[in-house]
Amino acid sequence: MKIITTVQEMQQITNELHASGKSIGFVPTMGYLHEGHATLLRKAREENEIVVLSVFVNPLQFGPNEDLDRYPRDIDRDENVAKENGVDYLFYPSVEEMYPAEQTTTVEVVKRTDVLCGKQRPGHFAGVATVLMKLFNITLPTRAYFGMKDAQQVAVIEGFVTDFNIPVTIVPVDIVREEDGLAKSSRNVYLSLEEREEAPHLYGSLCIAKERIEAGERNPEIIMNLVKEHIEKYTKGTVDYADLYAYPSLKAINKIEGRIILAIAVKFENVRLIDNITLMGK
């Protein structure tokens, strides 16, 4: 595995790989890698001749009161995870390398961002789309891999890749969970012991909702209230949102039918966790 820290060197390598016809699997991350990221890397390894991993904590996607400075970082750990999962190139640029001058152009996402995390974090997805446009141009991937824990992000990325005719296939990968159901996340380290015991109820509430939908419930409001009540009963967290939309359009629905997403965000004392399930409403 080779570690690359400059845009120029990374572009030179991927241009040569692209010219030789080799397939490139790309996994963009903000580091502090866990089993969820490892799953993305293994899938990329299975499906491509070359695997490129990026580790970059992107300041553009953090708001003024968010956890940019507190976001966990451990490049030694990330290097080990990368090596163990078959990464060929680890792209690890600095903020100054990625943004050497004041940004004069950003990618403004106008659909799929006014709900869920997009509603709570204005400007977040513009930051995500902007850095991905740069990373796609730098790494020239055949396929790019994203976890469905950030399902809204996947929907936004699929939309902007289509809109800009970017020649990359977006590969969504199922959420990886702890044994008790908690979605793996770099931010889980901020949970207190008590909160860690409560946190699996996020997924538990989604499972209860799924059972009700499969039993025939078609009223979104009833399902959302069921989720909120479960979380409020079994955790001390505050429900940021518990919403149900068509997926991937993220349009509001009056009746549960077709492919839908049920997504939640819960604020604990020092961390905000998200989770979701997608399913087909009959």
Curated annotation (Swiss-Prot):
Pathway: Cofactor biosynthesis; (R)-pantothenate biosynthesis; (R)-pantothenate from (R)-pantoate and beta-alanine: step 1/1
A Pfam family that the UniProt record links to this protein: Pantoate_ligase
Reactions mediated catalytically: (R)-pantoate + beta-alanine + ATP = (R)-pantothenate + AMP + diphosphate + H(+)
Active site: H37 (proton donor)
UniProt GO BP: pantothenate biosynthetic process
Documented EC number(s): 6.3.2.1
Binding site for (R)-pantoate: Q61, Q153
Binding site for ATP: 30-37, 147-150, 176, 184-187
NCBIfam families to which the protein is assigned, alphabetical: cyt_tran_rel (TIGR00125), panC (TIGR00018)
Role according to the record: Catalyzes the condensation of pantoate with beta-alanine in an ATP-dependent reaction via a pantoyl-adenylate intermediate.
Family according to the record: Belongs to the pantothenate synthetase family.
Extra remark beyond the main annotation: The reaction proceeds by a bi uni uni bi ping pong mechanism.
Subunit structure: Homodimer.
Protein name (record): Pantothenate synthetase
Species, as recorded: Bacillus mycoides (strain KBAB4)
